[in-house]
Amino acid sequence: MSLGARLNARLRDRRVTHALRRVLDDFLPPVIREWRPLNRWMATRFHGPAFDLDFKERAFAMSSRQIAAAYAALEAGGGRYRDTDTTPAQIAAITAAARGRVLEVGCGNGAVAERLAAAHPVVAVDVTLGSAAETRRRAGCAVALAGLPALPFADRAFDTVVCAHTLEHIPDLAAAAAELRRVAGRVIVVVPRQRYYRYTVDYHLHFFPSAAPLVHLFGGRAELIDGDWVLVAG
């Protein structure tokens, strides 16, 4: 296996990229950490040439359709470099906390939905066609093309809603949180523990170095698992 292939294989491990992010965010001087050429190189390495380094500067003025198109372009350009951002320990925590009929919002390629569908009736939604199709194939559950902050479901249509590695991408965080609380009695959320920088190798718009904002939005209790916050409320 070539050096590049070995590096890519290691980067597919979420725990490895957590360690790398900690080095970059906590130990590099800000003048280096925010150096645009370094971030451009890293973004291309992780996500391919379609990655927009200035996305977070523009996203708050974009429509939901424009944001969905940006993610579709990133996905089409090879932007998905790992099977899922949710680690096995996080998936285990999610499945242990889920109850009854489950909605997954931001299903990606279906890694979480696949596990949930083994024990629960599951409906999954995502804003990109590729993700929705892959989830349908992999999890065998009902899938819809939809996303936050407006879900096409009645109040309390589900017992549990799962939203893993999605909230940090939604411009209107308060509206998204209210929508998750509306459709289900129990909310399970996973977000990265990450501090803000102008340039990050992702399309994150919100940052959670502490779980306090998450608990304020949903109540419940947040636990740090494999470097990410996992919150269960309701």
Residue map of PLM features:
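Short catalytic micro-motifs in class I SAM-dependent methyltransferases
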Residues: H165-H169
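Activation segment
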Residues: P152-D155, I170-P171, R198
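Conserved beta-strand signature within the Rossmann-like core of class I S-adenosyl-L-methionine
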Residues: A184-Y196
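A short, conserved alpha-helix within the catalytic core of class I
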Residues: I170-E179
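Conserved N-terminal segment of class I S-adenosyl-L-methionine
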Residues: M1-A154, A177, V201-G234
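A conserved beta-strand element that flanks and buttresses the S-adenosyl-L-methionine
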Residues: V162
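Conserved acidic residues
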Residues: G100, D159, G185
